Each structure stands twice: as C-alpha cells, then as structure tokens.
Amino acid sequence: QNWPHPQIPP
C-alpha cells in the first residue's frame, strides 16, 4: 500500500 506521507500508516 502507498501512503501520501513517509510515515507509519494509521
């Protein structure tokens, strides 16, 4: 999966 932010997913 890809998140718009380079942070840990919720």
Swiss-Prot record:
Principal place of residence: secreted
Entry keyword set: Pyrrolidone carboxylic acid, Secreted, Toxin
GO molecular function annotations of the record: toxin activity
Location relative to the cell: Secreted
Keyword Membrane: no
Residue numbers of Pyrrolidone carboxylic acid PTMs: 1
Signal peptide: none
Tissue specificity field: Expressed by the venom gland.
Family statement: Belongs to the bradykinin-potentiating peptide family.
Name of the protein in its database record: Bradykinin-potentiating peptide-like
Organism: Bitis rhinoceros
